[in-house]
UniProtKB/Swiss-Prot annotation:
Disulfide bonds: none annotated. It is a single-pass membrane protein. The active site is at residues 134, 142, 182. It comes from Penicillium rubens (strain ATCC 28089 / DSM 1075 / NRRL 1951 / Wisconsin 54-1255). Residues 1-27, 257-292 are annotated as: Disordered. Ca(2+) binds at residue 139. This is Probable endonuclease lcl3. The gene is lcl3.
């Protein structure tokens, strides 16, 4: 029986045959299913290239600028004398060395305000997660270590460095690594209450000006970050010495028994540490670096 009544019998037959006809047509034309021409069209190629390039650039950018470095031995040779490390000071161990927690990208990358990018404050949470830094170009008086007596003005240098850097964000231009799992670096800090405020300060230079350290002297050489910086440091030391500031107070007094941090180390048998060469970074013409 035809339905609807006014339809012709031929139309009804066509409707009955439509599903089977469609299947047979699909079977007879497999090329329509595996048609690759769509993948060669510009409207497909251009978005694919843009998306792939964007992913690769993002991965490279993250690896180069946003990947956190946990400790000094993990620093790649590509950083030495070429790049700097930004981080927050977590502790000050001596008058010329301290530890920072690497915060790549700083606040712009979310450090300090995103919940998952907080600098740990508990000591156990910082274990194996900080970079040990030795200030370049200076030698501060030694605190009491391993049964050795404390050198005069060692406590003053340590107290000043702690108050100047503790919990502050600093930028360290990495020069070399040493055998104590540290990096020798020129360190810079900006402070709101300095004059002028937020001016970039060279920490080594500030210590020399105040007579809290001497220019680093060693038989195998020292690291200053270039000849220009060495001249600047030596001039700052000369002025502090002339004005008898800090550890230079008794320098000219006869019978005071004054000795420099280097002379103290030599007397205590604390030889120069061996440097660890990493990569092919060129030095400053002063020999290998081994600051202690």
């Amino acid at each position: 029986m035809r339905w609807p009544p006014w339809s012709s019998e031929s139309t009804n037959d066509e409707q009955k045959q439509t599903p089977s006809s469609w299947l047979s047509s699909a079977a007879n034309k497999p090329s329509s299913i595996l048609d690759w021409t769509a993948f060669t069209e510009l409207r497909t190629i251009i978005p694919t290239v843009v998306l792939t390039s964007g992913i690769l650039i993002a991965v490279r950018f993250h690896r180069r600028y946003l990947r956190r470095i946990p400790d000094a031995p993990s620093i790649s040779s590509s950083y030495l004398r070429r790049r700097s490390i930004f981080g927050q000071v977590t502790s000050v161990g001596d008058g010329d060395n301290f530890r920072i927690f690497h915060t790549p990208g700083g606040r712009m990358a979310g450090w300090g305000w995103l919940p998952w990018k907080k600098v740990p404050t508990v000591k156990k949470d910082l274990k194996d997660k900080t970079i040990h830094i030795r200030l370049a170009g200076v030698d501060a008086p030694e605190l009491a270590h391993f049964g050795r007596p404390e050198q005069p003005f060692a406590r003053d240098a340590h107290t000043w460095l702690t108050s100047y850097l503790s919990n502050r964000r600093v930028r360290a231009l990495v020069h070399r690594q040493d055998q104590y799992s540290r990096v020798v670096a020129s360190v810079f800090v900006r402070r709101a209450f300095d004059f002028p405020p937020f001016r970039r300060r060279d920490v080594s230079y500030e210590m020399l000006k105040r007579g809290l350290a001497t220019v680093y002297e060693a038989k195998i050489g020292s690291e200053f970050g270039g000849d220009k910086m060495e001249k600047k440091y030596r001039k700052a030391e000369w002025w502090a010495k002339k004005r008898a500031r800090g550890l230079w107070k008794d320098y000219r007094r006869v019978g005071s028994g004054w000795e420099s941090p280097r002379e103290y180390k030599n007397r205590m048998g604390m030889g120069d540490p061996l440097p660890i060469e990493k990569g092919n970074g060129k030095g400053n013409g002063k020999g290998k670096i081994g600051q202690k």
